[in-house]
Amino acid sequence: VFLIATMSAQWVGGAKLLAAFMGINYKTGIVVISIIIIFCVVFGGLKNILITDMIQGLIMIFSTIILLYSVISYGGGIENITNNLLSINEKILTPFGANGSLTPSYVSSFWVLVGVGVIGIPQIAINSMLYKNKRSLKQSIIIGSIVIFIVMFGVHLIGVMARGVFPDIKDYDSVIPIITLKVLPWYLAALVLAAPMAAIITTVNAQFLLISSALIKDVLFSTKVIKEKIVGRKIPIFVYSINILVIILIMFISMRPPSLIVNVNLF
């Protein structure tokens, strides 16, 4: 249940990204992102998920670096952007935020949750069981740490600097697509906007694999009636049908998003 709520945050982010880039309304974006996810996740399988995760990870790294450099250049350098932020509100660059809401306990718990707690999330734990050997596991720790640092540090820094470069942005969930379209030519914007879409798809891949497995194998196939009636060639059809129904459910949940996506993820 909670994972379905978390997945709805990915739908919201994907729909807002498509709305900003393609000029469509939010609800149309929800439908489009649902169709994309059906083809990427439902009919892909585990091997396809792992391959796409790797490709999308590379897209995220290069796009983060390109956008960070472009925002700094567009804003006239770090010093100029910093001065703009201070002119808006001197408290923006303090550890406690513009209105003092970022208390030490909130920030520390946030980073423990995001930085350490994710290791225990089921969809992450499943991927950790798929390493070929110990050598692959050790290599992934090093590579993963570098990748996470680049993406997490880069995207958060872009978000802060965007306030100094484009202070009129009100929809904070749409910051990345808005500034991308403003600071980059269309061909680079297309590449960079593939990064948040890649992040959305990789997250949904892992979460959906877990939900599908838990719902179908642990719940539905544990009942005697379904176990007896769904056999042979009926099993793949049944699995695909349940997966599509889950996606449709999440699609309807996402039609009325919260004010900020992070609230759903933290919940």
Segments from the language model and where they lie:
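Cytoplasmic-side transmembrane-helix entry/capping segments in multi-pass membrane proteins
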Residues: 54-60, 237-240, 267
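Loop-to-helix junctions at membrane interfaces in multi-pass transport proteins
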Residues: 58-189
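Helix-loop-helix junctions that connect adjacent transmembrane helices in secondary transporters/permeases
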Residues: 1-43, 127-265
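Flexible loop residues that form catalytic
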Residues: 34, 54, 63
